[in-house]
């Protein structure tokens, strides 16, 4: 069947959050905190290890600092409040020099400068637009990612965004994919879902969508991971 619509995941698929050291270093600089470089490296590694950076290392944290954070984790992407509380809860597991830094770190991850598009993202999205293929972004996320796409010149290629926190449901629930298809006037069998999570993004198959997976890697380690999407569309997936 002809592929008329492609849905993309956001984090780890089209864009990737900055490395944890840059995330922490930028936050410290913006708030006037100065730490020895060795301590910055150590704290960044700890933040990454506990899973405190949204969009960072995939997978659930090894352990949770408290019962409330553990309770929020499975539903963190269903509301902005749950997302913030879950990630700042994990961050507070790491002793930073100022408690306010936990909220500042969370705020930084929502800013466009904290995200890097994968090297081939622009060209692949432009290629889909040139082919007349509709494009949607379907993301498990707790904040509005549209400004990130605008800042990086990708928004012009996206026809609709379906963000979990705006609908109170998260992938792999088929309802989120159904909402995305509905916004684009698409049916499942004529849609290709592209993502990095077999568990979350694989949920699109319940609607009859074809699914293509990419690896969740740093942008420097995945220069052409999205390019096969154009071939799949040309071949009808």
Where are these regions (language model features)?
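N-terminal helical cap/lid subdomain that shapes the substrate entry/recognition surface
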Residues: 3-119
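Asp-based, Mg2+/Mn2+-dependent phosphohydrolase catalytic module
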Residues: 1-8, 38, 96-101, 122, ...
């Amino acid at each position: 069947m002809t592929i008329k619509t492609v849905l993309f995941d956001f984090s780890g698929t089209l864009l990737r959050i900055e490395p944890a050291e840059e995330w922490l270093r930028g936050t410290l600089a913006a708030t006037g905190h100065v730490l020895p470089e060795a301590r910055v490296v150590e704290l960044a590694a700890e933040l990454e290890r506990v899973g405190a950076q949204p969009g960072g290392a995939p997978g659930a944290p090894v352990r949770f600092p408290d019962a409330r954070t553990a309770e929020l984790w499975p539903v963190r992407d269903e509301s902005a409040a749950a997302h913030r509380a879950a990630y700042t809860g994990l961050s507070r597991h790491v002793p930073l020099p100022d408690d306010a830094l936990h909220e500042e770190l969370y705020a930084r991850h929502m800013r466009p400068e904290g995200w890097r598009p994968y090297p081939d993202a622009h060209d692949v999205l432009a290629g889909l637009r040139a082919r007349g293929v509709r494009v949607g972004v379907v993301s498990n996320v707790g904040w509005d990612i549209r400004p990130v796409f605008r800042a990086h010149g990708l928004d012009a290629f996206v026809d609709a965004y379906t963000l979990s926190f705006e609908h109170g449901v998260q992938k792999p629930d088929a309802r989120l994919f159904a909402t995305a298809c509905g916004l684009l006037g698409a049916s499942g069998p004529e849609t290709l879902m592209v993502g990095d999570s077999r568990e979350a993004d694989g949920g699109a198959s319940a609607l009859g969508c074809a699914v293509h997976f990419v690896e969740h890697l740093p942008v420097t380690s995945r220069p052409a991971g999205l390019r096969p999407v154009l071939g799949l569309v040309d071949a009808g997936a």
